[in-house]
Amino acid sequence: MDDNIAGSGFHGVYLLYCVNPKFKGHTYIGYTVNPNRRIKQHNGGVDKGGAYKTSRKKPWNMILIVHGFPNDIIALQFEWAWQKPTVSRRLKSAATKKKPRERPVQYCFRILSELLRVGPWNRLPLHIRWLMREYEMEFDPRCLPPFHMTVVYGPLVSRKAKQKAVSSEDQRPDHKEKCIKCLDVIKIDEKLIRCPKSGCTMTAHMFCLARDFLHCGNEGGLFCLPVDGNCPQCKGSLLWGDLVKPAESIPSAEDVDEDTDDHWTQGLRL
């Protein structure tokens, strides 16, 4: 999948940077299902759907967005913690107060670095996307994001929700396939996972493979969401996020904000 095309269930938390000379350097953090539309709303003012806090300080640049959240609830929790780090219980052990001479955008990025390393978000296959590379900042070597998260660049392309990405289910052959772990036939309404390694034909129930990854990583009973593991067939190293990566599509202008599609994490709930 093209990493710049964002299908079912895009949820992003973004950082705005004010370029109005009178307020230059001010920042704003928000949540969106459509970054391209949201920045137009912010720069259009309250009458165009923008936030009251950004209306009198426009124009703004959307410089960074974190996406890959499984649903709006988890993304909104992340947004709240990023907006209010000094009162977030997730960051109790971190230095959340703004340092002397620390610019607002530097402070926001430092708090982001801390958030990516704490639960529940530290196990999610998130993408940290620099929409405008001239604003890019390097992570402190002492506060790097988890290895399974990626730093990517460039704008996201809107796509109509009806243009679904081809999934593993869409590619199923006519003959019945068995789960490599439980050996049961994988039914058409069950989540199927394939090994992406060339030449490997491994197929498994999503839940069975998740349990296997957690057990092999000695994380069984601690978490319900694995981070990585090895293919039971070819033994290749796999990131869980690559196996279950959804087709994150940004709704086009005429689409509504609400997203009701199920996400792969639904299948991990006991």
Curated annotation (Swiss-Prot):
Q: Which residues form the GIY-YIG domain?
A: 9-94
Q: A GO term (biological process) for this protein?
A: double-strand break repair via homologous recombination
Q: What is its main location?
A: nucleus
> Any idea where this protein resides?
Nucleus
Q: Which cofactor does it need?
A: a divalent metal cation
Q: Which residues cross the membrane?
A: none
Q: Which top EC class is named for this enzyme in its record?
A: hydrolase
Q: Subunit notes for this chain? A: Forms a heterodimer with a member of the SLX4 family.
What is the protein name for this chain?
A: Structure-specific endonuclease subunit SLX1 homolog
Origin species, per record, is Nematostella vectensis
